[in-house]
């Protein structure tokens, strides 16, 4: 597998032999990675960094529909299967099974994101933001731990915030046969994924921060700017 092949295949793995890995890291050295859980403030931090420091932002969530349209069910099996589930189907499974399925989904989505990055011309620093940034995969793509950061919302904060995120949450739950059970399994799944992200980032020596709502978003963005090495500006 060559680097040119990686660039040509949206779902191609960015992890291969040593020569390919080195070339991929070189081509992505301008990329910063901001991952983490739902309700952790990733998108707001990215927006503030873009405004204060001029960094371009790639939102994995915003790319989802485009990737969904380009996905090959024979190649991106988990991405297509999980992405096509209705809420009632998604949350009907036990939380542990949901978490396992979602990690496979995120892994395939991340490879599609990497495909986009490899096809893009390198330039000014680019901040990639999204829940699909799995620590072990990102670790293979960076030259320095300072290129990556994960924000993980605490259980209590995430559950409180989800209930205030707007009518779309209630609408999704209303489509389920057992709305209360669906919400509980949804939150339990996210608890499992949060613990997993923390353990993985810690194991790999990568930075993760707990978000409980006690820090103003401006302060969180300023701390993220310092982590990534931005100077000056006001977040």
Residues covered by each model-derived region:
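ATP-dependent small-molecule kinase phosphotransfer cores
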Residues: 66-125, 132
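Hydrophobic anchor at the beta1->P-loop junction of P-loop NTPases
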Residues: 34
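NTP-dependent small-molecule kinase module
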Residues: 3-4, 9-13, 18, 192-235
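Short beta-strand-centered segment that lines the nucleotide-binding/catalytic pocket of NTP-utilizing
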Residues: 53-71
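Phosphate-binding P-loop
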Residues: 21-29
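Walker A/P-loop
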Residues: 43
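A glycine- and Lys/Arg-enriched "phosphate-lid" helix/loop adjacent to the NTP-binding pocket
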Residues: 146-193
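ATP-binding Walker
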Residues: 37-40
């Amino acid at each position: 597998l060559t680097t040119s092949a990686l660039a040509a295949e949206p779902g191609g793995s960015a992890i291969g032999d040593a020569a390919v890995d080195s070339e991929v890291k070189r081509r992505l050295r301008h990329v910063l990675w901001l991952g983490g859980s739902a309700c952790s403030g990733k998108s707001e931090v990215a927006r503030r960094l873009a405004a204060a420091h001029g960094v371009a932002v790639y939102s994995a969530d915003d790319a989802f529909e485009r990737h969904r349209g380009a996905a090959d069910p024979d190649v991106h099996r988990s991405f297509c299967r999980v992405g096509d589930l209705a809420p009632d189907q998604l949350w009907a499974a036990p939380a542990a099974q949901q978490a396992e399925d979602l990690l496979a989904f995120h892994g395939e989505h991340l490879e599609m994101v990497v495909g986009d990055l490899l096809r893009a011309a390198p330039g000014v620093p680019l901040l990639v933001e999204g829940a699909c940034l799995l620590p072990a995969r990102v670790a293979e793509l960076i030259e320095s731990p300072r290129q990556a950061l994960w924000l993980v919302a605490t259980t209590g904060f995430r559950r409180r915030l989800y209930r205030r995120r707007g009518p779309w949450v209630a609408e999704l739950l209303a489509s389920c046969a057992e709305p209360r059970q669906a919400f509980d399994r949804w939150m339990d799944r996210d608890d499992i994924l949060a613990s997993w992200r923390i353990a993985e980032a810690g194991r790999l020596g990568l930075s993760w921060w707990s978000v409980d709502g006690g820090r103003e978003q401006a302060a969180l963005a300023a701390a993220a700017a310092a982590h990534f090495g931005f100077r000056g500006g006001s977040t």
